[in-house]
UniProtKB/Swiss-Prot annotation:
SUPFAM superfamilies: P-loop containing nucleoside triphosphate hydrolases (SSF52540). This is Tetraacyldisaccharide 4'-kinase. GO terms for cellular component: plasma membrane. Belongs to the LpxK family. One of its GO terms (biological process) is lipopolysaccharide core region biosynthetic process. Keywords: ATP-binding, Kinase, Lipid A biosynthesis, Lipid biosynthesis, Lipid metabolism, Nucleotide-binding, Transferase. Pfam families: LpxK. The gene is lpxK. It is an enzyme of class 2 (transferase). The keyword ATP-binding applies.
Length: 325
């Protein structure tokens, strides 16, 4: 229903317009207060790059963060990552991730980024506190913040927006009548707009999510996902249909697709109930970090990597690297 409202297919969005105007006024006033100097943002002693969204819902932001961290690491840059840690609840903040940190403490995306990149990761509702924790513990040269485009309390040097190339901005309205956290005109002020799927427009960087081999959660064995049989697909991400479409494009045809809420807490019983005898469970890598501790033999995940096209990605990386002292 939310997807139909935000796309404009359902007329119910009109009933939510008063709340959207209120959201827009409040969010606009907050941004203006920082722009005019009524509120002061905290500036880190190292460059800060924000990777965020203009819309609610999954746009492919986390794969972009991983891509950016890995590319900078390849250039010899020491990178730290901060996040709000949505979906997790730590005993105390800021929380510096370790190999023992769980998704229940830090949230699924920070744990995934930590496991994939090996970069220092810290989470805190107040992102400046997370930055300070990383700087106190690690000699990093640059901070990447996973989400937080609208978190103006943290000053930033580079802003990158990730856009769903198929859904783009829906009906164009602020939350809750539409998907917008800020108006599309905000794109004029960011340093780069990366478009996940669909058709990129002039000045935007095209991106595709490239699937790899399916990985068994228990053994680490790898195989072409199309070789798996009797698949039940599970996706607890911002936009589950994208994952299901990826499986179909890979030649895997699930018998059942189970969309879950983004950041949904998963118990062993919850997941086991999805799979019948003789069936194979295939999930996203983000779900896998939550399920690995209680995984069964027939559970697999499909990793994806961000692939950015054209000359702009290299120019963006050069620009970011030039900020590092």
């Amino acid at each position: 229903m939310i997807a139909r409202i935000w796309s404009g297919e359902s007329p119910l969005w009109r009933l939510l317009l008063p709340l959207s105007w209120l959201y827009g006024l409040v969010s606009g006033a907050i941004r203006l207060s920082y722009k005019l100097g009524f509120k002061r943002a905290w500036r880190a002693p190292v460059p800060v790059v924000v990777v965020g969204n203009l819309t609610a819902g999954g746009n492919g932001k986390t794969p972009v963060v991983i891509w950016l961290v890995e590319k900078l690491q390849q250039r010899g840059v020491r990178v730290g990552v901060v996040s709000r840690g949505y979906g997790g609840k730590a005993a105390a903040y800021p929380l510096l991730l370790t190999p023992e940190t769980t998704t229940a403490e830090a949230g699924d995306e920070p744990v995934l980024i930590y496991q994939r990149t090996g970069a220092p990761v810290a989470v805190a509702p107040e992102r400046a506190a997370a930055v300070k924790a990383i700087l106190a513990a690690h000699n990093v040269q640059i901070i990447i913040t996973d989400d937080g485009l609208q978190h103006y309390r943290l000053a930033r040097d580079i802003e990158i927006v990730v856009i769903d190339g198929v859904r783009r901005f829906g009906n164009g309205w602020w939350l809750p009548a539409g998907p917008m956290r800020e108006r599309a005109s905000r794109l004029k002020t960011v340093d780069a707009a990366i478009v996940n799927g669909g058709v990129a427009r002039a000045g935007e960087i095209p991106m595709q999510l490239a699937p790899g081999l399916a990985v068994n959660l228990r053994t680490g064995a790898r195989c072409d996902v199309a070789q798996l049989s009797n698949i039940v697909a599970m996706a607890g991400i911002g936009h589950p249909p994208r994952f299901f479409a990826t499986l179909e494009a890979c030649g895997a045809h699930p018998q059942k697709c189970v969309p879950l809420a983004d950041h949904q807490t998963l118990s062993p019983a919850d997941v086991q109930a999805l799979v019948g005898e003789g069936q194979t469970l295939v999930m996203t890598e983000k779900d896998a970090v939550k399920c690995r501790a209680f995984a069964e033999d027939n559970w697999w995940f499909l990793p994806v990597d961000a692939r950015l096209s054209g000359e702009q990605p290299d120019k963006l990386l050069e620009h970011i690297t030039s900020l590092v002292r």
